[in-house]
């Protein structure tokens, strides 16, 4: 069985084909980073228009890569939310239209479930149950996962997501969009301990996060110190260490409260090398395991949507003829599979 996956929730157009026996057959991705760089962030209207231009050509490229034709596709999965409404509508409209034309089921997929299941694409996928850290530009959540669709929200950011804080702080440091990866690169040249940033909300019980204050602390530190390259690198290092430590402390609490031995890390920020190293070290000390997708599957991509679509299709999930998207869509609302 083969599922075509379409991802257009923000500023990446991702198309992939997943086979339940052979695995990933094709993976095509187009990033709009250069398009939005001059604006310092994603412009929703520009994102939607670029998805219109790229989605169908990428589908054609994916079919060619896999050596397949439309008649070989058994279902079409598309991201139905959460995300930018215009961008979502492009993928949903194309996906629903192709499914109708090809006479196959259409499968609406939750974007964050796609991220959560992305590590399942690897050779050593995690078994249930596990704690999932979903950490990206739009979300920072800790979730108890006991099965497909069996998700319990343990904690989340009450303001900025971790990835958003990375990007905003990078902008304060004069780095171009997207700033998160560039800040991490700068931090690798920084001196540990020169600046010490707070670890927000770790001095009290609970599993919620808050990163807006950390961003403000960074802004004040930048204003109060020199603008030389080493100082900026030291500030970047202090900021990254604070975010990583905060995430690690909360993950440890979540594992302690659930009693689980497995931690899954997903979303764009999960590609951060410092975060991966710290969580791997923590899980080794706890005699547990940490799982994450390869870097190209941490950011938005069609492969995770094709895989999640396969899982949901086997559970009987399909869409009607209408095109419906949900820019806001709590993960806990998904049914168990």
Curated annotation (Swiss-Prot):
Signal peptide residues on this chain, from the entry's feature table: none
Function: Required for the formation of a threonylcarbamoyl group on adenosine at position 37 (t(6)A37) in tRNAs that read codons beginning with adenine. Is involved in the transfer of the threonylcarbamoyl moiety of threonylcarbamoyl-AMP (TC-AMP) to the N6 group of A37, together with TsaE and TsaB. TsaD likely plays a direct catalytic role in this reaction.
CDD domains: ASKHA_NBD_TsaD-like
Name this protein carries in UniProt: tRNA N6-adenosine threonylcarbamoyltransferase
Alphabetized UniProt keyword annotations: Acyltransferase, Cytoplasm, Iron, Metal-binding, Transferase, tRNA processing
Location(s) in or outside the cell: Cytoplasm
UniProt-listed InterPro entries: ATPase_NBD (IPR043129), Gcp-like_dom (IPR000905), KAE1/TsaD (IPR017861), Peptidase_M22_CS (IPR017860), TsaD (IPR022450)
Cofactor(s) for this UniProt protein: Fe(2+)
Top-level division of the source organism's lineage: Bacteria
Binding positions (Fe cation): 111, 115, 300
E.C. no: 2.3.1.234
SUPFAM superfamilies reported for this sequence: Actin-like ATPase domain
Cofactor note text: Binds 1 Fe(2+) ion per subunit.
Species assigned in the record: Salmonella paratyphi A (strain AKU_12601)
């Amino acid at each position: 069985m083969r599922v075509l996956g379409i991802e257009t929730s923000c500023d990446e157009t991702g198309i992939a084909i997943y086979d339940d026996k052979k695995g990933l057959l094709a993976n095509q991705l187009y990033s709009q980073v250069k398009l939005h760089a001059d604006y310092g962030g994603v412009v929703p209207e520009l994102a939607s228009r670029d998805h219109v231009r790229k989605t169908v050509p990428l589908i054609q490229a994916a079919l060619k890569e896999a050596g397949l034709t439309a008649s070989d596709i058994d279902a079409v999965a598309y991201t139905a939310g959460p995300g930018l409404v215009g961008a979502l509508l492009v993928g949903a409209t194309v996906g629903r239209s192709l499914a109708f034309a090809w006479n196959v089921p259409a499968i609406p997929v939750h974007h964050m479930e796609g991220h959560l299941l992305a590590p399942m694409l690897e050779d050593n996928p995690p078994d249930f149950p596990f704690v999932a850290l979903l950490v990206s530009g739009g979300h920072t959540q800790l979730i108890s996962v006991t099965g497909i669709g069996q998700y319990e929200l343990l904690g989340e950011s009450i303001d900025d997501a971790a990835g958003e804080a990375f990007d905003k702080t990078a902008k304060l440091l004069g780095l171009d969009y997207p700033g998160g990866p560039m800040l991490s690169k700068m931090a690798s040249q920084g001196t540990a301990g020169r600046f010490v940033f707070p670890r927000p909300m770790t001095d009290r019980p609970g599993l919620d996060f808050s990163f807006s204050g950390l961003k403000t602390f960074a802004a004040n530190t930048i204003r109060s110190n020199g603008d030389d390259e080493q100082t900026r690198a030291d500030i970047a290092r202090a900021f990254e260490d604070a975010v990583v430590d905060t995430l690690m402390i909360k993950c440890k609490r979540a594992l302690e409260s659930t009693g689980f031995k497995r931690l899954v890390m997903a979303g764009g920020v999960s590609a951060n090398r410092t975060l991966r190293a710290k969580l791997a070290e923590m899980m080794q000390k706890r005699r547990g395991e940490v799982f994450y997708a390869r870097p190209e599957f941490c950011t938005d991509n069609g492969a995770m949507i094709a895989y999640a679509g396969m899982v949901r299709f086997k559970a009987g999930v399909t869409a009607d003829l209408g095109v419906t998207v949900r820019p806001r869509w709590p993960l806990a609302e998904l049914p168990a599979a």
